[in-house]
Structure formats: C-alpha cells, structure tokens
Amino acid sequence: MRIATMNIQNLFHRDLSFLRQNASKNLQDWMEEFQSLLKNPNKQHQELGRMRELAFLMGFSPQATEPFLTLRRKGGHLYVKPLGGERQTKATERVGWNGWVELRSYPLDEKHRNAKVECIAKADPDILVLQEVEDRASLSDFNRDYLGPKLGGAFEQWLFTEGNDNRGLGHAILTRNGYRIVGFQPHAHERDQEGNDLFEMDCPEYTVVTPTGDELTIISTRCSEDSRDVDYSAKRKEQARRLDSYCNRLFGQGKDWIVICGTLGEVSYGNSLRPLLSDRKVRDITEHTVFEVIGDNEYKGFSNNESHSGWLAKHDYLLSSSVLYDRINRCGVYFPRVAQKTPISKLAPFKINVMDKPILAPPLLWGDYEGV
C-alpha cells in the first residue's frame, strides 16, 4: 500500500484573500525598488521596463486589475469587461442582460498545477490525501482530466469534505486499486477553550478498507500556523492534544492501523506538538532510515529539522502508528519542479503578475507499507 499526502493549496482557483495577506509587504518592497531605480541617472532599457512593471503593481497604471468586472451577454455568450469603460444601456431587448459580479477568486497558473500532478504521478499512490481543496467539482475535474491520463486511469473513489473555512477550503481523499472508502467522521463541530472552531478546516477521519479486508484510519489535518502578527502555539497545542485523543480512542477500539497526515504548523520538537509526538505512538516518515528526497537537487541526509529548496519539511508530516511504521519499506518526499523566473533585482527578484503571485510549490510526502 502506498499513501501520499500533499497540501495542494487549491487546484484551479484561489481566494483573493491570499493575495491581500501580503499586500502591504509587497507594496513596501515595490516602492523601495521603484525609488532606487528612479535615482539612477543612467537607466538602461531593462530598468525602464522594470519601472513600468512596478508602476502597474503599485496602481499607477490604468491597466491595473480591478476587483469588479462587468458581465455581458452577447450572441448567447457571456463577456466581461473592466469597470470604468464606456457606459452601457441596462437590460433591453436589443442589448440583452447586463450585470456585474464581484471576483472572489483568481485562476492558478497551469505550470504550478502541472508540477503538482507530476509529483503525484511519480508517487503513484493507492491512497491520496489532499488538504486545501476548493470544492468537489474541482476535485472531480482534477481527478479525471489531470490525474487520470498520468496514472493510466483516474482514482475510482474520491471524497471531498468541506470544513469551517469561510473560503470553502476542505480536505479530500482519493483511492484506487481495491482500496475503498467506507467511513467518514468529521470534527468540524469541535470547539476550543474560547468557544471558537478548534479546526479552521476540519480534521476528518477516513476509514479505508484494504483489498485484503483490513481496516485503516486516516486523519487529515491542517493545524494553525503562526502568522506575522499572531502566535497560535496555544491553539496548536490544543489541536495536538485532540489529535492524541483520537489516537487513544482508536487504539482502545483495537484499531492500530492509523495514519495522520497534513500540516501541523510546528517543528517536531516544538512544545505545541508534545501532546501528539512525545510518547511516539505515531512517528513521522522523515525519521525512517529509508526516507529519501527527490526534487530539483537531491540532498542526502535530509531530516525533518532541515530545509530543502526553501521548504521546511518539519511543518508537513506523514505520521504512522507503530504497527504501520514498522511496515514501511520505502518513503520520501517529492518536490515539484517549477521553472524559476529570471532575477531582476534584489528586492523584487522575480517578475510578478498581480493575479499570479509567486508561491512556494508544496511538497508531496509518501510512504510504501509492506503487506498492507
């Protein structure tokens, strides 16, 4: 049995709030770079081009992307055009329907999606667990149109579970080769000590039956991560404590085939994860002697306390109960190969498109379990 997990960070479109999170920091960098270029008395063609880009990014250009578009129906088709253009007649028999729509998401770059697909195809898993999936329709299209051609056939079963995230993000599990999804238990209703949602994106338990009839429990999680302004270590510790209670409940029921996967938001030796990791009831694959790294530059001796290609492995985990951990014969991490753009300056090293903010491609963790 091969299990793979990945924080997919959306399949086809991403909520605009992700763009706004770092807007102030980006704007500050753009202003500093623009000012430094402006002071240069001998500007070259490349520098002038960069200044035009910065003017667009900072809102000087009239071509800046707007949060609203006009939606028109013409000849049986819908068209969009930016606001602020020519005034148009409202709905009439001649013009047809006119209206406006607020954009809540933006499309993701195809190359980032293809890089993720390549990682999944290399892992070739029987069970695939994904975090931060936008909706079931996108999951279905992704499975059929992207994974199917790469894997010689789409996953036979898939399940999307939406949690508490107001952007609609949720978890997904896909299975094939005789592995069947037979049970699901949500934890979206659980509260923290302050009465708020304990898990911002739920923490679903999936029950999977193997081709031999054995039962496996997979818990997909997305714990709180610290931001620039907020420390979530207390809440993360409460989440880890609750995850530990799920394991104890399952062990008490005689279910010792348990996998916990996803983002825990902390280093393995961090205090907030002690309730889950200190007694080693579940262990991470990065500790295993057969753990391997595959990416743009393979790095031997990689551990969950180190970095590779700018990604901190210590925040993403594939944990296995002791029984399953002893059955691992291969495991590792795949890093998506995303083409790097040509550097332009130290402050803004890549050309940036407002609707395609460069993101760090997430890794894929996988484990091969013998006799399961």
Regions found by a protein language model. Give the residues of each.
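N-terminal, active-site-proximal structural segment of metallo-dependent hydrolase catalytic domains
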Residues: M1-P149, L159-D165, L364
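Metal-dependent phosphoester-hydrolase catalytic domains
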Residues: R2-A4, D192, L198, R249-V259, ...
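Structural recognition of the beta-strand scaffold that forms the well-ordered cores
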Residues: R2-T5, D126-Q131, I173, T217-S220, ...
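Catalytic metal-binding/acid-base residues of hydrolase active sites
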Residues: Q9, E134, R222-S224, L264-V267, ...
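Structured beta-strand-rich core segments of catalytic domains in phosphoester-bond hydrolases
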Residues: A64, I127-T217, T221
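Stable alpha-helical elements in mature extracytoplasmic
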Residues: H112, K116, D135-S138, R236-Q239, ...
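Active-site environment of divalent metal-dependent phosphoester hydrolases
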Residues: D135-A137, N166-G168, D226-R228, G265-N271
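A long, amphipathic alpha-helix that forms part
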Residues: V230-D256
